[in-house]
Each structure stands twice: as structure tokens, then as C-alpha cells.
A protein has these predicted regions:
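Small-residue-rich midsections of specific transmembrane alpha-helices
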Residues: 24, 30-35, 51-77, 131-136
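Interfacial/gating helices of multi-pass transporter permease domains
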Residues: 35-59, 182, 215-217
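C-terminal transmembrane helix end/exit motif
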Residues: 72, 139-146, 150, 170-173, ...
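Transmembrane-helix boundary and interhelical linker motifs in polytopic inner-membrane proteins
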Residues: 6-11, 42-46, 60-94, 145-151
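Alpha-helical transmembrane segments of multi-pass membrane proteins
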Residues: 59-63, 97, 101, 105, ...
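Membrane-interface junctions at transmembrane-helix termini in multi-pass inner-membrane proteins
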Residues: 84, 133-156
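N-terminal membrane topogenesis motif
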Residues: 1-30, 84, 213-217
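Hydrophobic alpha-helical transmembrane segments
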Residues: 120-128, 154-202
Length: 217
């Protein structure tokens, strides 16, 4: 019984269990540290504005990709490693980006039409396209999760946390609230770029999704 348990633990460790556990702890520490630094850098008024804008963004993100991410997790797991799986991811990436571009215009219009303070209103315009970059990152992560690339999944999550929190702190220090969101874009672009370099070998980013789906049907 004990030997079976040891073997099971070793198998899980080889599949990246310890990487995922370690990355989770590491990311929480980085996020917590970043929040403490952010409170010290920004004034009470600036932090209040940042929290307000961030909360509204989180509300809009309830419509993130219109469920594409959850769908890819489900169908990707069913058709793992098949041409159809790659086609689903390509199709989902396109649809998710289109949905979030529409969402981006909604966020921008909300800021321009319903936020009276002009300095706060412009922040909604600045953050409006963050969901577009966010869903690309999330789909890349789901892809790794489906294929059980647990080690890269963990490293990629940590990379995103470090870049975003680092960008947040640096942006806040030099440019205030606007800098936070501006550097968030830079961090997300860097993370997406790293993901594309790794995922290029899979070929799904470049395949014709409609042709593959039609053939499989």
C-alpha cells in the first residue's frame, strides 16, 4: 500500500504536480507583495480610482469571450491531440477575440457616456482592450491544460504574474493609475509573445479551422 502511494506521488510529480503547487504559492506571494507596494505608491484617491475602474472591468469580464474558454476546456479534453482539437482552438481563439473586441467598445462607451469625471472616464478608454489580450492568454493556458503540459502551464502562469505585477508597480511609480494599465498591456503582450513562440510547434494557430472541422464531420 505504501509503495503504491509512493509510486502515485512520483507519477504526479513527473506530470508537473509540484510545479503547479509551487507556481500557485509563488503567484500568491508575488500578487500579495505587489498589492502592498501599490498601496504605498499610490495616494488614497488614486488607489480608490484604480479599484473602481478595476471593479467595473471585472464586471464586464463576466462576458469574457462569451464562454469560449469553458467550451475549449470541455471539447479540447474530449478531442485531445486530434486535428479537431487544434481546429476548435483556432476557431475559439478567433471567436473569443471578436467577442472581446465588441466588449472593448462597450467598456470604452461606458466610460465616455456614464462616467462624469473626465480623468476617470479616459481610464476606461485606456483599459478597454485589456480583455482582448486577456482572452488570448487564457486560451493559451487552456491549451496547455488540455494537453497536460503542466510544467509549462505553471511556468507560463508565473511569467504572467511576474510581468503583470511588475508592470503594475513600475507603471504606478512613474505614471500613476494610467501607468498601471499602460504597463499591463506591455506585460500581456510579452506573455502572449512567449506563448506564441512555444505554441507555434503545435500548428493550431495557423490551421484552417473550418476545413478541419468539415473533414472530421
Amino acid at each position: 500500500m505504501r509503495n503504491n502511494t509512493v509510486i502515485l506521488i512520483k507519477n504526479l510529480a513527473q506530470r508537473g504536480l509540484m510545479h503547479m503547487f509551487g507556481a500557485n504559492v509563488f503567484n500568491k506571494i508575488i500578487s500579495f507583495s505587489g498589492t502592498i507596494l501599490l498601496v504605498r505608491i499610490l495616494s488614497k484617491g488614486e488607489y480608490g480610482v484604480y479599484a473602481y475602474v478595476q471593479n467595473i472591468l471585472s464586471f464586464f469580464l463576466l462576458l469574457n469571450g462569451l464562454g469560449v474558454v469553458s467550451g475549449l476546456l470541455q471539447y479540447g479534453s474530449v478531442y485531445r491531440n486530434s486535428p479537431l482539437m487544434y481546429a476548435f482552438f483556432k476557431y475559439g481563439l478567433r471567436r473569443g477575440v471578436i467577442a472581446n473586441i465588441i466588449l472593448a467598445f462597450g467598456i470604452g462607451l461606458f466610460g465616455l457616456l456614464f462616467v462624469k469625471d473626465s480623468s476617470t472616464s479616459i481610464l476606461f478608454v485606456i483599459i478597454s482592450f485589456i480583455p482582448v489580450f486577456t482572452i488570448i492568454y487564457e486560451i493559451f493556458q487552456i491549451y496547455n491544460l488540455v494537453l497536460r503540459n503542466n510544467k509549462f502551464y505553471s511556468l507560463y502562469t508565473s511569467l504572467n504574474t511576474v510581468l503583470v505585477m511588475g508592470g503594475t508597480v513600475v507603471g504606478a511609480y512613474f505614471l500613476g493609475v494610467k501607468g498601471i494599465f499602460a504597463f499591463t498591456y506591455i506585460a500581456l503582450l510579452g506573455c502572449i509573445g512567449a506563448g506564441m513562440v512555444y505554441l507555434k510547434r503545435g500548428g493550431w494557430i495557423w490551421c484552417d479551422a473550418r476545413v478541419v472541422i468539415t473533414k472530421e464531420e
